[in-house]
Amino acid sequence: MDVREGGRGAARRGLGRAAVTVAVLWCCVVAACTSTTREGTRSAPEVRAWVTTASGSQKLSDRGPVPFSTGRSGEPDIVVENGRRYQQFFGVGASITGASAVLLDTLPDDVRSRVMRDIFQPGQGIGLSVLRQPLGGNDFSTSDFSFTPGRDEDHVLPLLTEAARLDPSLAVVLSPWSAPASMKTSGSLVGGSLRPEDAGAYADYLAGAARAYLDAGVPVRGLTVQNEPSFSPPSYAGMTLDTEQQRTLLRDHVAPALQRAGLRLHLWALDDNFDRWPDADALLSDPAKRQAVYGVAFHCYRGDVSALREIRDRHPGVAVSVSECSGGAWSDGFAHELRYEARTMLVGAVRNGAAWLVKWNLALDPQGGPTNGGCQDCRGLVTVDPSTGTVTPSPSYYAFGHVGRFVTPGARVIGATARTGSDLDTVAFRNPDGSHVLVVFNDGSSTRDVRVETGGRRFGYRLPAGALATFTW
């Protein structure tokens, strides 16, 4: 991560040993629910509303039904157009890093199970459906290491398989921070680049790791070849790759290695910050060489989210996503973080073409750790405090729940236009079952009576300033 700004029981099919746990409390304020479907997939003759306010007094709160009307008095603030269809959307997520797994394993089995249900089970909590998983050592692993089968058995793997059990639609994308030290110019996991003569061996290493996870019951669906290839971290595993190295590695080595292994995975290029989009553009510039690339993955720490649109416009048919975006101490309170997530991630990234959105650590402690030499002020989607036994959701947790709980993986982004000058940010989805999800953020300084028109019908809702709302019908 380059922020230069700013067992439990055995896994289903082994890659766990029981871990000692301490008594703690789960203090996540999420209503209990036994449904196995996402809220947005329930067809209804009326609209339902869920709201998170800027003060945090309401957090993904069910505000009950909102009636449709056929009246047309006044100009609508938002028009939802089912006929305008854009990219498929596969969900929101995070990363179960080594730090996250160790912290979650301090929880008693029943508490940890409830936390996992509230995070991953469709229709309950926030409905994460994507995990971007570090492959080997990274800035939030317990140490620097190269992947070997069995290395993740104690902590990470059992949580991955539990998440997959809770959500059968879960998709995992693997991302390495470094090639094994023996394949690098530095002879170390820290620093250096990939030796050209070891590109084939590295590709086989990646394919072997993906196969090992799949055999252990982890639903691996995608792969990047290098986390932040433009950045060489000084104190933890990392590796630089220039554009030509990435292109050659993807096309000539990784794609063939996956094919030989019988693996059909999406290959994601870049896996770096928004401001590196010209690198992705150059990587994709030769049509004959871009065939191996399914999409381009971005991080949020530098540059602007419009980078996704730059790639979509220049390279039609290439998917884009946000594969890492940490919260941290730089956020100025609940309202500030909620606004960022709503405007930049949930609305901004999706309207610019994102197929999925991922935060960074699923869980960290109150000090932003444990770390392995990287970011010292990051924050997890939830904060686990082993000393007090509390698990506290972040504002980003609730923000991501406004999409994850209601949008089914494979949904289609559809037209949603806010009236000019309305201070409303919005994005809409149509689920595979035909139900609709509308996400609206009021970026104004006062409460708004929001009028929404869709399919010849209208509904209205009084939305406080700085509030995020999800409407389903």
State each model region's role.
Residues 226:
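Function-critical acidic carboxylates
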Residues 2-39:
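Secretory targeting and sorting signals
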Residues 342-345, 373-385:
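Acidic, Ser/Thr-rich peripheral helices and adjacent loops at domain boundaries
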